[in-house]
Amino acid sequence: MHLTDKQIEDYKNLGVIIIKDVFKDWIEPLRLGFQKVLNDPSKHGRENVTDNKGRFFEDYCNWQRISEFKDCIFNSQAAQIVAEATSSKSSQIFHEHIFIKEAG
């Protein structure tokens, strides 16, 4: 998958583009990775509990220990899309950050 010239121009002008179905094959593997993080959070993992119903959990910097995250980073089209959208020769991951908000 390559971005169109219009998508690249839209990204430059708007800072955002919608690309449908690019990551659909990654949903289930990433869901498994999220569950692994929930079962074994990193030192950055936080449960943000308030009087509101519904759990809110966040964690980050797990891509090196959660194989599903690392696999997506290195084997999905994410890096290529970012490089094309920004007209860069490469892209670099700083860290991933997950947020899980349950209903309520």
Listing of model-derived features with the role each one plays in the protein:
Residues 1-13, 20-104:
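Non-heme Fe(II)-dependent double-stranded beta-helix
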